[in-house]
From Swiss-Prot:
Source taxon at top rank: Eukaryota
GO molecular function: DNA-binding transcription factor activity, RNA polymerase II-specific; RNA polymerase II cis-regulatory region sequence-specific DNA binding
UniProt-recorded name of the protein: Pituitary homeobox 2
Keywords (A to Z) from UniProt: Cytoplasm, Developmental protein, DNA-binding, Homeobox, Nucleus
Gene name in the database record: pitx2
Annotated DNA-binding residue span(s): 82-141
Compositionally biased spans, kind Basic and acidic residues: 40-50, 59-77
A single cellular component GO annotation: nucleus
GO BP annotations listed: anatomical structure morphogenesis; camera-type eye development; camera-type eye morphogenesis; closure of optic fissure; cornea development in camera-type eye; determination of digestive tract left/right asymmetry; determination of left/right asymmetry in diencephalon; embryonic camera-type eye morphogenesis
Motif Nuclear localization signal in this chain: 282-286
Length: 314
């Protein structure tokens, strides 16, 4: 009986074990299928998410904004690079740059590099400094020219339009006849030629008006320039005859004034001038004879140093 029970028990036990094994098998299969389903679900979700993102432009813009924010948060040095940094020059650097600018306002590359080495600056800084300095120089030049045009040239051009009202307040137009030549204004002036000859330029009528007497005519005859002595003898003789007919006693009695000049120069110095101006001298002699002036004394009889007598060759 026991032997019969044993196989049954064994079979029963085996069956039970098989049943338990069959129960565990679906559990293991389900557990193995769960990760596969999760992976499939995740892939499906990713595909749907990408399709929805590409289809909507708003999501694309959001992604771009997020990427920019991430880049800006990752690299904050870009903002610092965009800012312009001011260079603070020392007095020695400015002195060297100004001295070079006075010599050359447009330095080339090699000169800028040399200046950069001297001043311990970069070539770009030196180039920018020269550019700004030239702009400042041009602005100053324009301002100076504008000031000159306003202050300097303006009054000059206005003065050309009305010169006498501004520059000469005491002057009036068309006042020559009313004023005339006053003795007070001329007596204060010095005339060395008249003072040397003891002649008053206002009292002697021979300088400003025709002579009124024979004595004044004789004085004027002595003051005739020396070039008149080169007039031919015929005209001189006619003038002498006219003077003798008028009053021969006065002609001989009036003394000749003292000559302030030195002795005459050699005779042939004035030869060319006398020959060239012979026609003009003849005309002057005729004018003297027509106005009634006294004639010049005969050069052959009475010559003085004042008359600059010229010995004509025979």
């Amino acid at each position: 009986m026991t032997s019969m029970k044993d196989p049954l028990s064994l079979d029963h036990h085996h069956h039970n074990h098989h049943v338990t094994g069959s129960k565990h098998a679906p559990l293991s299969m389900a557990s193995s299928l769960q990760p596969l389903q999760r992976s499939v679900d995740s892939k499906h979700r990713l595909d749907v998410h990408t399709v929805s993102d590409t289809s909507s432009p708003e999501s694309v813009e959001k992604e771009k904004g997020q990427s920019k924010n991430e880049d800006s948060n990752d690299d904050p040095s870009k903002k610092k690079r965009q800012r312009r940094q001011r260079t603070h020059f020392t007095s020695q650097q400015l002195q060297e740059l100004e001295a070079t600018f006075q010599r050359n306002r447009y330095p080339d590359m090699s000169t800028r590099e040399e200046i950069a080495v001297w001043t311990n600056l970069t070539e770009a800084r030196v180039r920018v400094w020269f550019k700004n300095r030239r702009a400042k120089w041009r602005k100053r030049e324009r301002n100076q020219q504008a000031e000159l045009c306003k202050n300097g040239f303006g009054p000059q051009f206005n003065g050309l339009m009305q010169p006498y009202d501004d520059m000469y307040p005491s002057y009036t137009y068309n006042n020559w006849a009313a004023k005339g030549l006053t003795s007070a204004s001329l007596s204060t002036k010095s005339f060395p030629f008249f003072n040397s000859m003891n002649v008053n330029p206002l009292s002697s009528q021979t300088m400003f008006s025709p002579p009124n007497s024979i004595s004044s005519m004789s004085m004027s005859s002595s003051m005739v320039p020396s070039a008149v002595t080169g007039v031919p003898g015929s005209s001189l003789n006619s003038l002498n005859n006219l003077n003798n007919l008028s009053n021969p006693s006065l002609n001989s009695g009036v003394p000749t004034p003292a000559c302030p000049y030195a002795p005459p120069t050699p005779p042939y110095v004035y030869r060319d001038t006398c020959n060239s101006s012979l026609a003009s001298l003849r005309l002057k002699a005729k004018q003297h004879s027509s106005f009634g002036y006294a004639s010049v004394q005969n050069p052959a009889s009475n010559l003085s140093a004042c008359q600059y007598a010229v010995d004509r060759p025979v």
